[in-house]
């Protein structure tokens, strides 16, 4: 009976994604979003002809062959890549080395091209959850000097360059994702300066040099999975945001994000208020958002609304 319910839920979610009309904007979107879609322990992302499956539970892993068959039926001719993080396998007591590696896919999002490579980037290969936020921010960058902090594979920075920013700099500590980011800039025939650095000393140096930007993006990786570590995570967010605010010119735009599900939106906004106070800056909040409609969350599971996005004007 449980398997029948899972199969019915899975089929319903695939149909619902069609109703959302996601293909009009992008060929990269989330097909199944774990408990938000009633399929806890399963995440599926579609990147053009490549479908990436991530298992978070032994139960979903046991049904993997049915899951693969259902995806191939819905996306004829697709390639399937599946994996599970080591910590999940240890926690859930199953062993999975993953399917055969697949070549990266080239996806298009609002006219901007990216390489989605599950073997060479964090998570399933591309952060489709930021699609709407990238598009919104890119409407405000023409002729502007843009700084993309914790840039990963260059999503916000490449968008900004495509949309006419005068200068774009991306900073990340991970050289592997920066190599993908440079490839993404090349795919779109735009110039972005990517720097491999820890953002803390980099921002302190920028402040010492009086270096300021019209638009600053701060999108760090998840801080913690442990409820006991939420307060230390908020302290790190505070330190990061305080430094990043110092790089925004007066009247500039600041976009800050948290993908730590255990950090609530009210906690994140309070952290941002304190960061503004300590940085001596006034923050005018323009927009508070999250992930796109292909990343639904359940009202009774608030931590499943993991992505917080805040866009501010800074004085």
Where does each model-flagged region fall?
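Conserved class I S-adenosyl-L-methionine
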Residues: 143-150
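Conserved SAM-binding loop of SAM-dependent methyltransferases across substrates and taxa
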Residues: 153-166
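Conserved SAM-binding motif I beta-strand of class I
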Residues: 167-172
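S-adenosyl-L-methionine
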Residues: 176-214
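Mobile active-site "lid"/loop adjacent to the S-adenosyl-L-methionine
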Residues: 177, 213-243
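C-terminal catalytic and target-recognition region of SAM-dependent MTase-like enzymes
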Residues: 239, 253-315
